[in-house]
């Protein structure tokens, strides 16, 4: 809202007053930083979806015949996949494959908070529940009126499953509703069989997964991530989404908002945001902030190295060379900078 209506906020001083009051709360600035980083991470969603569809799934299909030769999947039991009974050949088979490397990368993205579930649920948003605009941003709860007539003594397993889904930190609220309504499409007997298999062990696993994610990212970070994923689905998948301006097509450079600048214009905040842009290969966005930092810090060779790298990645070889030479003046011992300077000179000669 602050970004969409950034030109109007100055007309409402009470908004700035409210932010000033919130700024006295411990952790307020950290929360703003987290929100900004999560919006940057949301840019990766389409990339992740394409990687799944174009790389990981085809690789799994190619690997399937080889896997069945090494492992008899029909005779495989849960005990074979746990404890010290794991066949080392199976582990090496996965780790040595292209798929194994991609799955490790995929797992790291999930731990970071990336939206790895979007492609799974993109076609499961056609239930009547999602025709109601407000339902797209509702926290998942078994108290919802849609579940009122579902719980009887005969389907206690369903209630247990819903309770467990509430704690699934790796899924946003919208996807939890999608999963439930999809399962309700199954025939009663098939659904009952599935629910019975959803025993306390599965519940314990979800709880453990939740604790692991929260311990690595923090509870607040997890909630922020889930909300932004819900928001992403609304702007991309809601039946009437074309009636709204898709905020995820905007730059979302919150650090440039006048109303937020008093809280995130410090060196630490700007550096964190710029480093995250750089790590995600958004070189133009990172460069804008690095240039801003360079105005007050002309003595950091690392800063000018990064400015040079961003300019080089953006195709500005002359600008990159200038930044690298400045970095070399500050620290002539960096072999990386010397190689970059040589590379820029070589490229400029051949232009």
Report each predicted region and the residues it spans.
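Conserved small/polar residues in nucleotide/adenosyl-binding loops
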Residues: 349-351
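Non-catalytic protein-protein interaction scaffold segments in large eukaryotic complex-forming proteins
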Residues: 29, 33, 45, 49-200
């Amino acid at each position: 809202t602050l970004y969409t209506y950034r030109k109007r906020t100055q007309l409402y001083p009470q908004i700035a007053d409210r932010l000033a009051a919130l700024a006295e709360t411990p952790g307020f600035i950290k929360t703003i930083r987290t929100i900004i980083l999560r919006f940057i991470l949301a840019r990766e969603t389409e990339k992740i979806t394409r990687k799944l569809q174009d790389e990981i799934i085809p690789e799994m299909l190619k690997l399937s015949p080889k896997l069945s030769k090494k492992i008899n999947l029909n005779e495989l039991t849960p005990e074979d996949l746990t404890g010290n009974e794991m066949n080392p050949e199976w582990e090496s088979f996965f780790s040595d494959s292209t798929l194994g490397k991609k799955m490790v990368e995929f797992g790291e993205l999930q731990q970071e908070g990336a939206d790895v579930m979007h492609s799974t649920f993109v076609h499961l948003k056609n239930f009547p529940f999602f025709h109601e605009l407000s339902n797209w941003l509702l926290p998942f709860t078994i108290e919802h009126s849609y579940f009122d007539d579902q719980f009887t003594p005969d389907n206690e397993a369903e209630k247990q499953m819903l309770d467990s889904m509430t704690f699934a930190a790796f899924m946003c609220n919208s996807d939890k509703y999608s999963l439930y309504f999809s399962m309700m499409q199954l025939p009663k007997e098939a659904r009952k069989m599935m629910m019975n298999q959803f025993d306390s062990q599965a519940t314990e696993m979800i709880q453990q997964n939740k604790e692991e994610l929260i311990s690595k990212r923090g509870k607040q970070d997890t909630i922020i991530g889930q909300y932004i994923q819900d928001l992403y689905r609304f702007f991309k998948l809601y039946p009437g989404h074309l009636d709204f301006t898709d905020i995820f097509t905007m730059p979302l450079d919150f650090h440039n908002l006048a109303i937020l600048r008093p809280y995130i214009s410090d060196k630490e905040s700007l550096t964190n945001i710029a480093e995250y842009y750089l790590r995600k290969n958004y070189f133009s966005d990172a460069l804008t902030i690095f240039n801003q930092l360079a105005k007050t810090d002309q003595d950091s060779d690392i800063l000018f190295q990064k400015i040079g790298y961003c300019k080089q990645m953006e195709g500005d070889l002359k600008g990159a060379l200038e930044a690298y030479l400045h970095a070399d003046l500050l620290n002539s011992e960096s072999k990386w900078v010397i190689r970059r300077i040589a590379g820029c000179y070589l490229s400029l000669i051949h232009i």
